[in-house]
Curated annotation (Swiss-Prot):
Top-level taxon of the source organism: Bacteria
Protein name, per record: Phospho-N-acetylmuramoyl-pentapeptide-transferase
Principal localisation: membrane
Native species: Actinobacillus pleuropneumoniae serotype 7 (strain AP76)
UniProt keyword Cell cycle present: yes
GO cellular component, one term: plasma membrane
Gene: mraY
Protein's job: Catalyzes the initial step of the lipid cycle reactions in the biosynthesis of the cell wall peptidoglycan: transfers peptidoglycan precursor phospho-MurNAc-pentapeptide from UDP-MurNAc-pentapeptide onto the lipid carrier undecaprenyl phosphate, yielding undecaprenyl-pyrophosphoryl-MurNAc-pentapeptide, known as lipid I.
Species lineage: Bacteria, Pseudomonadati, Pseudomonadota, Gammaproteobacteria, Pasteurellales
Length: 360
């Protein structure tokens, strides 16, 4: 929005030309989103408390979690507000890629909101009926994916970048739609499963979004894309603004979500953030890199799949409890230790992911 205003005002003062630079707008988007999150946080928490929107806790979970019962949830609302306002202010809204990410972000946020609401109303952790939850997640993802495919179905926009391989970038064609669907829905649910401890999901999200800000900038820059041997996607550069808005909103939320948490993001936050990360990965053609950098999310999701599969097939559990962060808690690890260890692992994986862009 401010891009349009600056384009008009630059005729009166060339200083407004600074708004045309992605780097400037990226920094401002981060600061704006973080400022909004810090500003509205106390009021959002107060209103959630008044509405009695408190977290429900599994009875079979770690005993240390029982004290979390009643902590305000659905704090992801403040994340969505911060990202939305910051993006609308600083992104070039003529860019269709920005709207694809916002569509998934708020669409998944709406599904998460309903899921959280039913958990609170029923006073259990069941939430929205699973088949309806996945139905709406699938509908939103497919609408976005078909839109992305229609807008950019040239060679670069549907290539699959394989880490560590410079020249091997297979053309997916129609299979782009299938892969993209699973990336968006899968990432959304993986982040959702990770969101079980104070700050456990938001910090890895911040780290991965920061990395994607760099990748989006390189992907949207012809010279850097050629240098790194990655597909050049002209519209991708504007996604830097969205990535830094996610980082800023995440930092603002972390202020209130760090141990011991004053508020939880709920499904309204985790589903939407995961969906946004998945969509960004699809748009910059780095789906496989997301698997590396978001390794913590992947392991959390796999632990649940393996646990459920093992119990159904053998009536035996692999872990003491899934997702895997609860396994470590039941082994006696203090919650802060589990959280920080997962943060460190994510930092390592993000750095490895960035290095793969050059080591090919």
């Amino acid at each position: 929005m401010l891009v349009w205003l600056a384009e008009y005002l630059v005729q009166y003062n060339t200083a407004f030309n600074v708004v045309s630079y992605i780097t400037f707008r990226a920094i401002m988007a981060l600061l704006t989103a973080m400022g909004i999150g810090l500003w509205i946080g106390p009021e959002v928490i107060r209103r959630l408390q008044l509405l009695k929107f408190g977290q429900e806790v599994r009875n079979d979970g770690p005993e240390s979690h029982f004290k979390k019962r009643g902590t305000p949830t659905m704090g992801g609302i403040m994340i969505l507000i911060a990202i939305g306002v910051s993006t609308l202010l600083w992104a070039d809204l003529r860019n269709s890629y920005v709207w694809f990410v916002l569509f998934v972000l708020f669409g998944y946020g709406a599904v998460g909101f309903v899921d959280d609401y039913w958990k609170i109303k029923r006073k259990n952790t069941d939430g929205l009926i699973a088949r309806w939850k996945y139905f709406w997640l699938s509908v939103i993802a497919l609408i976005a994916v078909f839109g992305i495919y229609a807008v950019g179905k040239d060679t670069a926009a549907t290539q699959l970048v394989v880490p560590f391989f410079k020249e091997f970038m297979p053309q997916l064609g129609i299979f782009f739609i299938i892969l993209s669907y699973f990336v968006i829905v899968g990432t959304s649910n993986a982040v959702n499963l990770t969101d079980g401890l104070d700050g456990l999901a938001i910090v890895p999200t911040i780290m991965v979004a920061s990395a994607f800000a760099l990748i989006a900038w390189a992907t949207g820059n012809f010279n850097f894309a050629q240098y790194l041997h990655i597909p050049f996607v002209p519209n991708a550069g504007e996604l830097v603004i969205l990535c830094t808005a996610i980082v800023g909103a995440g930092l603002g939320f972390l202020w209130y979500n760090t141990y011991p948490a004053q508020v939880f993001m709920g499904d309204v936050g985790s589903l939407s953030l995961g969906g946004a990360l998945g969509t960004i990965a699809v748009l910059v053609r780095q789906e496989l890199l997301l698997v590396i950098m978001g390794g913590v999310f992947v392991v959390e999701a796999l632990s649940v799949i393996l646990q459920v599969g093992s119990y159904k097939l053998r009536q035996k559990r692999i872990f003491r409890m899934a997702p895997i962060h609860h396994h470590f808690e039941l082994k006696g690890w203090p919650e802060p230790r589990v959280i920080v260890c997962f943060w460190i692992i994510t930092l390592m994986l993000v750095l490895i992911g960035l290095v793969t862009l050059k080591l090919r």
